[in-house]
Amino acid sequence: MGVEKRINDEEMQPLAERDDKSRDSIDSTSTASISLALLGGANGSAHGSRAARTRKSENQEKYHDDEEEGDLEEGFVPPAGGWSAPRKVSVIFTLIVTLCIAGWLVAFFVLLGRHKDSSKDAAVSQGESNIIPGIYSGGRGGKKLDLDGVLFGNWSPKSHDISWFPGPNGADGLLLEQGGDRNKAYLRVEDIRSRNPGNKADDTIVLMRESSFMVGKRLVRPSKVWPSPDLKTVLVMSDQRKNWRHSYTGNYWIFDVETQTGEPLDPESLDGGIQLASWSPNSDAIVFTRKNNMFIRRLPSKNVKQITTDGGTNLFYGIPDWVYEEEVFSDSSATWWDGDGKFVAFLRTNESRVPEYPVQYFIPNTNKPSRPSEENYPDIRKIKYPKAGAPNPVVNIQFFDVEKEEVFSVDVKDDLPDDDRLVIGVTWASNGNVLVRETNRESDRLSVVLIDAAKRAGKVVRSRNFSSLDGGWVEPSQTTHFVPADPKNGRPHDGYIETIPHDGFEHLAYFTPMDNSEPTVLTSGDWEVVDAPSAVDLKRGLVYFVAAKENPTERHIYTVKLDGSDLQPIVDTKSAGYYSISLSAGAGYALLKYEGPDIPWQKVISTPANEEKYEESIEKNPGLADMARKYALPSLHYQTITISGYELQVVERRPANFNPDKKYPVLFHLYGGPGSQTVTKKFKVDFQSYVASNLGYIVVTVDGRGTGFIGRKARCAVRGNLGHYEAIDQIETAKAWGKRSYVDAGRMAIWGWSYGGFMTLKTLEQDAGQTFQYGMAVAPVTDWRFYDSIYTERYMHTPQNNPEGYDRSAISNVTALDQAVRFMIVHGSGDDNVHIQNTLTLLDKLDLGSVKNFDVHVYPDSDHSIYFHNANKMVYQRLSDWLVNAFNGEWVKTRDPIPHKSLARRALGLINILRNG
């Protein structure tokens, strides 16, 4: 399904002749062209007639709707015999023409001056372009992308998720396989070595033969499964119901592998609505949370013991509340078993002081019947949502002693106070020791606490002030990796690996013993590791990690020894690549994913240190490659732009039929949030690809200051002042593009979603119509006081400590927004993340400022992803249609809809009056 107003012919692109730069380029064929036509006529030349006819044909292009203007130009073609007018007419005529030219020149230099003013904050230079046309692209002769194909996942590469399973006796290379092959059992564990050619042994362990089972008269169909570590039992969840982004509830069952029968996890509650459940490392117990309280069932007993009793609306045990799920753990679990199965650590969250935000749902929910007489009222869900500056949930780590059946906590000297503590990571070591990573509320002071659960004692072993270091912050992370002692292999003490700032970049560090605050730095250089480490080969003392070492837009896989020596790539680093990896429990095998820039593929391989060599291709995406050959995918031009000393990554998407002699409108797309990255070399066919391929526009993305993998200096520059420098980077990049011969600087737009929506509005506000004429903001933050505390205060401090920064970052200068030709805002009314309060508050400011140059659309009951009731398709269709209208000049016409005579036509009318007078 296409966009109604688009025109797909290649020749319908803007022509190079069009060089006007003004915001109103479409409705100003311009005084200059009118004056030149008049002068040509005065000289009796027929050239003006040919120019007018040529101009008219050009104005019938895709991005123009200038038929009326074409008619005006035709009106200036003189009679074949030339003019025969009294001398006074010629004098007046000359004066009028002179005034026209003078007016045009004044306007030109005023506009030129406007463009220079906002450049004073940045020195701009551009790097060389690295072009990736796409080997498989159908090029100029290919079909244009259609929006439905992009939205419905036709261009999503096929991928296989492999769940590596640690063998009961330390065996490496075991895979958990679920479904997929009707000739095999539904749930099974396979040894990767059995797949080698010539190996006839069947080492498969069957866990579940069928994809469903009966419990009494009830049919159970698994939504998720978790085998026990000894592979004798399977924990099964059915009837999964979504809660927030990562969390869900469901009914839980225990399935016996030997008898192939199941029973309820809690025999006393068949419809448990359980929020979380997890196995003991010894396979002899399951701990779970229901209605915010924790329980444990120790097998083979059928009895369930309640661990906590006061959980409820304000108290959570073992699971995160909304803000911790969203901003800290990115997961539904806040429960951690120790490696020996003797203790369970869990998060206790007290939300009693956290204010509520009511999310209203207006569309009747057939799965949730209303009470009589209330069916015509909105359903309201109240969320404990701490906005910036509001009271936070109070959290602390508690422990459950499995043998003693006791809950306890540990007081730590010099620990952060309750109301100024965020728990951002928990990692068990050996012998009941656990490492807890904490920060203060503003996330710029790190405190690492080592607790001995057996002795019920703890101490702060490491602390760091990131505000003093570089003015930055600590990002929450759950990648800390425990490295157990092994004296025979040169490790006399327990230790751990995590990412730390080192010389301005994020690098790997090995801390040993556990209470050592001075690590061995494993990596260094002007590049950064990514979510590292991926795994540690304990036998060989090798650390596997992913890094943006070759280029910030790329990812390659490396190893380094625990002493920091012998850093080696395990994939080709000579060509551009974006890789990810999932390693087996012993790091002897890996699922290697190549994600771009070419067609993605996947392999299961043995790692270089493994003497048993293995390689199996499990996905080459031939269907995707074949489809790409048939379509006109845009070419990607990667380059850098240096603004105020910061080298930033840019990608430009050009239509496959790109002609450098034509003039193209440009759409900027951004996200831009702190630590994020949008410019990568992953294979991706998305809305931006559709805009370039189908609509024929150029699409540019620049990762500005604040984004990830370009060093802490660039990332931390935005702290306390979100939006300011990021907007400068968008504006300066747009100005640089506007100077290119193939770009129509009079038709430039910007769009983004979420943080990108905020940045769209902030850029339009800061630009005040000088560079960008149009913008589209989806689910935008408009005032950081309205967003959640943990995310916002990490980058902005609290409103109490930085009131001026919050004032500056809010979208408030509606006079500046009014300088754009037009912008659009869309939002889901059921957004639990970026509340519609953001958009409504901005609309009120726009109304108070009598600003009218915007459109707004609300999607009923949609959350932040905007999916409810066909909304996702509709929001992208709306973006596409609106953009076509913008670049066709529809919004320019609405600015001055009253019919009027142009200056030139009035001049011609005056001449006719004088001639006839």
From Swiss-Prot:
One GO biological process term: proteolysis
UniProt xrefs under SUPFAM superfamilies: alpha/beta-Hydrolases, DPP6 N-terminal domain-like
Keyword Cell cycle set for record: no
Domain of life: Eukaryota
Subcellular localization: Vacuole membrane
One Gene Ontology CC term in the entry: plasma membrane
Glycan attachment points: 350, 465, 813
Top-level EC class: hydrolase
Residue ranges of the TM segments: 91-111
Segments on the Vacuolar side according to the record's topology features: 112-917
InterPro entries per the UniProt record, alphabetical: AB_hydrolase_fold, Peptidase_S9_cat, Peptidase_S9B_N, Serine_Prot_S9B/DPPIV
Residue spans of biased composition, Basic and acidic residues class: 16-26, 55-65
Renumbered residue ranges of the record's region Disordered: 1-78
Principal place of residence: membrane
Active site: 754 (charge relay system), 831 (charge relay system), 864 (charge relay system)
E.C. number(s) listed in UniProt: 3.4.14.5
Topology of the protein relative to the lipid bilayer: Single-pass type II membrane protein
Reaction(s) catalysed (UniProt annotation): Release of an N-terminal dipeptide, Xaa-Yaa-|-Zaa-, from a polypeptide, preferentially when Yaa is Pro, provided Zaa is neither Pro nor hydroxyproline
UniProt family annotation: Belongs to the peptidase S9B family.
Name of the protein described by the UniProt record: Probable dipeptidyl-aminopeptidase B
